[in-house]
C-alpha cells in the first residue's frame, strides 16, 4: 500500500513538474513574441480606407507603425506592410499614380510579410473572378469582389481560424476567395466560403479584425 502510494505521488509530482515546465515555456514564448513585436516597424498603406484602426491595434500590441501616403514614405525602413480595407479600385489606381506600385510589389515578391484586409485581399489576388482589373497580383488566390456586398451587406459572425480558435469577424461589403492554388493555405471559411488564407509571407482576410477588440489575427501576422 505504502509503495503504491509513493508511486502515485511520484507520478503526480512528475505530472506537476511537466505542467509547470509547459506553463514556463508558454510564458517565455509570449515574452519573446512581445519583445520581437516591439522591435518591428509596420507600414500601413494610408491612401484610402480603414487604416487608422489597424494603427490602433498595432499600437496596442506594442509595434511601431507609420503611414504610407506618398512616394517618399516608401523609402523609410519597415519590416512588414498592411493593406487596409476600402475601395480596391481607388487604392489600385492611387498605387500607380503615386508611383508606389512597383516598389510595394517588389518588396512583397522579395518576401516581406504583407497583410491585406477586404480590399487588400483583392489587391493581392492573382485574379478577380468578377472584375477584369489587375492589381499587385502577388498571391495565388482568385477573389470574388463585393461578393457579400451584393447579397448580405455588412454582418458580424464568429468562426474558426486555423491556429487561433474561434474569432469574431466583421464583414463590410466584403469579398471572399473563390479559389486558392499553388501553396496557398486556407485559414478560415464561413458558410463554405473562403474568408482567410495565407501563402508564405502573404496573409489575407475578407473580414476586418481591426474593427473588433480581438487582436489575435494581427498577432498572427506580426509573428509570421
Whereabouts are the PLM-identified features?
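Cysteine-nucleophile active-site neighborhood
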Residues: 88-159
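Amide-donor transfer/coupling interface in amidating biosynthetic enzymes
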Residues: 9, 145-224
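Redox-cofactor binding/interface segments in oxidoreductases and associated redox assembly factors
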Residues: 82-83, 116, 205
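N-terminal beta1-alpha1 cap of cysteine-dependent amidohydrolase-like domains
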Residues: 32-97, 102-107, 215-219, 223-224
Amino acid at each position: 500500500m505504502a509503495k503504491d502510494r509513493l508511486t502515485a505521488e511520484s507520478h503526480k509530482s512528475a505530472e506537476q513538474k511537466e505542467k509547470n515546465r509547459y506553463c514556463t515555456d508558454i510564458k517565455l514564448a509570449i515574452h519573446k513574441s512581445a519583445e520581437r513585436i516591439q522591435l518591428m516597424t509596420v507600414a500601413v498603406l494610408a491612401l484610402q480606407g480603414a487604416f487608422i484602426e489597424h494603427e490602433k491595434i498595432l499600437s496596442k500590441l506594442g509595434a511601431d507603425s507609420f503611414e504610407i501616403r506618398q512616394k517618399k514614405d516608401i523609402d523609410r525602413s519597415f519590416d512588414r506592410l498592411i493593406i487596409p480595407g476600402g475601395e480596391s479600385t481607388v487604392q489600385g489606381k492611387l498605387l500607380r499614380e503615386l508611383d508606389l506600385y512597383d516598389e510595394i510589389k517588389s518588396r512583397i515578391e522579395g518576401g516581406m510579410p504583407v497583410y491585406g484586409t477586404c480590399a487588400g485581399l483583392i489587391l493581392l489576388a492573382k485574379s478577380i473572378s468578377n472584375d477584369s482589373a489587375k492589381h499587385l497580383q502577388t498571391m495565388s488566390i482568385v477573389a470574388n469582389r463585393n461578393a457579400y456586398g451584393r447579397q448580405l451587406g455588412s454582418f458580424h459572425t464568429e468562426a474558426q481560424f486555423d491556429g487561433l480558435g474561434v474569432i469574431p469577424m466583421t464583414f463590410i461589403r466584403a469579398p471572399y476567395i473563390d479559389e486558392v492554388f499553388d501553396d496557398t493555405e486556407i485559414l478560415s471559411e464561413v458558410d463554405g466560403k473562403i474568408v482567410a488564407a495565407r501563402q508564405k509571407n502573404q496573409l489575407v482576410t475578407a473580414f476586418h479584425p481591426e474593427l473588433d477588440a480581438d487582436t489575435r489575427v494581427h498577432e498572427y501576422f506580426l509573428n509570421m
